[in-house]
Amino acid sequence: MKFAEHLSAHITPEWRKQYIQYEAFKDMLYSAQDQAPSVEVTDEDTVKRYFAKFEEKFFQTCEKELAKINTFYSEKLAEAQRRFATLQNELQSSLDVQKESSAVTALRQRRKPVFHLSHEERVQHRNIKDLKLAFSEFYLSLILLQNYQNLNFTGFRKILKKHDKILETSRGADWRVIHVEVAPFYTCKKINQLISETEAVVTNELEDGDRQKAMKRLRVPPLGAAQPAPAWTIFRVGLFCGIFIVLNITLVFAAVFKLETDRTVWPLIRIYRGGFLLIEFLFLLGINTYGWRQAGVNHVLIFELNPRNNLSHQHLFEIAGFLGILWCLSLLACFFAPISIIPIYVYPLALYGFMVFFLINPTKTFYYKSRFWLLKLLFRVFTAPFHKVGFADFWLAGQLNSLSVILMDLEYMICFYSFELKWDESKGLLPNDPQEPEFCHKYSYGVRAIVQCIPAWLRFIQCLRRYRDTRRAFPHLVNAGKYSTTFFTVTFAALYSTHKEQNHSDTVVFFYLWVFFCIISSCYTLIWDLKMDWGLFDKNAGENTFLREEIVYPQKAYYYCAIIEDVILRFAWIIQISITAHVGDIIATVFAPLEVFRRFVWNFFRLENEHLNNCGEFRAVRDISVAPLNADDQTLLEQMMDQEDGVRNRQKNRSWKYNQSISLRRPRLASQSKARDTKVLIEDTDDEANT
């Protein structure tokens, strides 16, 4: 692998601008070589002056890059030292409390079943668990910084070697010895010491001396391109998707036959539509995950997933394919129910019952950790006023807004099975009299309207909670106003529908109010999508017209197509309200998957915007703490900032003299004297063809 590709694959995306600009240096060298005057037509002195001038510019650029790398490394190292001191304080406090407790006298006792513990023991158990997670995230940040150190040194060595080869000189090697090999980012070995001390602390204080268990907890996922999925996972993805395609073709022919013999199949459509939307959502989320990884958007950090164990796009395709097969088989069974001994109403119940069981299955099988994460996130979403709202919380609530049809169809299914289904018949899901008006299709008692408002309500109260936490009216209250327009839209749609059925004279008034709030809501959400969620139409966009200054995805056409798509689908309701009710139901069924697709496109650019925010803050790992930063920690941080090897003022002298000793006056743990050195090796080849 060429080093440029290796560098691109192994950098930390949030620190991309802080790495050596290897490609820019290569272009600089090749451009100088191409533009150099020929010895055949120019005297030798002119050629020498040309290359001397170029080398002066080249080494000045190298100095700027080296200063940038030194400064960034010093900042991140000071941050790591502060973080390690804080974690040591938190761990020492937990150990002190544990020693004072008569109920818990050793760390081993915290492993007994949680439901046998007292309240104090539960809190202590949770603190130790949080500390383990915090140390594992901190260890990951250290490995990333060590990786940054090694990649940049290798980059300088490679580019200076290439310089010497192209210009047929040794000044590049001399410059490396004089400047790079004495630079703080390379000579400072404090990062190795922190890695060793972290391993020792986790081994001796949190894992009772079991180094193998400690290193398993601290294991760092491969730094670089996505690792290939297990062969069996890929096999299952191909198998499930192939079967799903075949069953879909069969389903189309069966549906045509069913429509020819029985044209009143609307209940089947309503009952099975939600399942299809869920499967479509999972499949498109798999494509989202693949696209984010390919573009370098760190969705694992954004969603605060466990970097050591999370679902890849192959796993999402596998789940979507498996559920898709069950959905097809269940619907086919309904079509052929008249020749079956099993009543038709059993099949939908079996399908959705299995889906619910798959999600809440308490056994540690079928992606247990991911399912538990989703259930916990759903709980946080539905109890939003009582929790601090994170990105994953409002992202999931946003997805529910595009999946509101699933909630409405669930309400319809419950109503249908409760009031319209003839349980003593097995011919079909429809009432005996097709001409009988459907009770569950109406806005009876406002239940459908309330269900339709639930997703918007969840986002609304999340915005209020974020305002309570931050006291920032913009954007949180303004965003809450956006979701409040949904309440008016749904309310007037319900009033229009009920008054129209009863032939009231004020029906037209509610219709115009409905259309008015639809326009307000669509314009509001469209502007918010493009400007706030996606960060587009930035006045400093430069050459990225109507976009933003920095874009992640390679083609600008992606952004322009997404803008057009968002405008069209945000105003697609115009088609739905301009036609008859019967055809309107069909159009609504067509638009529901399109709304899921719109959300799929939205996901790409919303996470890109969040990723760029993380890049601006150089945030590459989760910051997990048991306790907030106290006064002592703040004082230590300020002292560290004032030290020579702490975070230095960028405007002051950037001398390469570096004092590697920093005194951290913290309670020493027993494990600190047993630290062992660990190093991450960076692939390095001296073959010039690979540079």
Swiss-Prot record:
Which parts of the sequence bind phosphate?
401, 482-483, 570, 598-599
Q: Does the keyword NADP apply?
A: no
**Catalytic activity as recorded in UniProt:** phosphate(in) = phosphate(out)
Where does the record say this protein resides?
Cell membrane
Q: How does it sit in the membrane?
A: Multi-pass membrane protein
- MF terms (GO), sorted A to Z: efflux transmembrane transporter activity; inositol hexakisphosphate binding; phosphate transmembrane transporter activity
Q: Where is the EXS domain?
A: 439-638
Q: Where is this region: Disordered?
A: 667-691
Give the main localization category: membrane
Q: Where is this site: Gating residue for phosphate transport?
A: 573
- Give the sites modified to Phosphoserine: 663
Q: Name one GO biological process term.
A: phosphate ion transmembrane transport
Q: Domain SPX spans what residues?
A: 2-224
One cellular component term from this protein's GO annotations in UniProt: plasma membrane
Which parts of the chain span the membrane according to its record? Answer: 229-259, 265-296, 310-337, 344-365, 389-422, 430-471, 473-503, 507-534, 554-581, 583-621
Q: Its quaternary structure?
A: Homodimer.
Query: PANTHER family from the entry?
Result: SOLUTE CARRIER FAMILY 53 MEMBER 1, XENOTROPIC AND POLYTROPIC RETROVIRUS RECEPTOR 1-RELATED
Q: Function, please?
A: Inorganic ion transporter that mediates phosphate ion export across plasma membrane. Plays a major role in phosphate homeostasis, preventing intracellular phosphate accumulation and possible calcium phosphate precipitation, ultimately preserving calcium signaling. Binds inositol hexakisphosphate (Ins6P) and similar inositol polyphosphates, such as 5-diphospho-inositol pentakisphosphate (5-InsP7), which are important intracellular signaling molecules involved in regulation of phosphate flux.
Report the protein name in the record. Solute carrier family 53 member 1
